[in-house]
Amino acid sequence: FRATTVPVGEDQEPMIEQAREIVRRFNFIYGDTLVEPEILLPDNAACLRLPGTDGKAKMSKSLGNCIYLSDTADEIQKKVKSMYTDPDHLRVQDPGKIEGNTVFTYLDAFCRPEHFERYLPDYPSLEELKAHYQRGGLGDMKVKGFLNNIMQETLEPIRNRRKEFE
């Protein structure tokens, strides 16, 4: 598809660098034929290495803890609902932990201020949502529902564009 930029996570940089080496060598031998791909890393530090939906170190196809760009809306909703949160946050009134909570890691990566206006107008910011969760009185399902809305909005244009090429 003549891509010049490849969006990757930090763990994929070596593979792209290897491809760049091959392109340089190929072009040296056969003339300027191939485009050397540029690496595009996310600006947001939370996106550099997203954990798997089960809270494990990273997404893994073999562990089944990935959200794919090709997932349907129902598949994404199911995966978000099953995401790892704070195991000690058993009731809505219990205080919850943010650190290590996969749902909040994904919110850090994907949430933008305009999402609150559309999907959670009672909260002005992600910081306020986190503070309420830590105080108690905010359930996991409400936070997961918010994340699901964000993921659907983010991935829908990608899914639609992908369908054009299938």
Predicted regions and their residues:
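Conserved nucleotide- and phosphate/pyrophosphate-binding catalytic cores
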Residues: P14, R20-E166
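Conserved alpha/beta enzyme-core scaffolds, especially Rossmann-like or related mixed alpha/beta domains
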Residues: F1-Q12
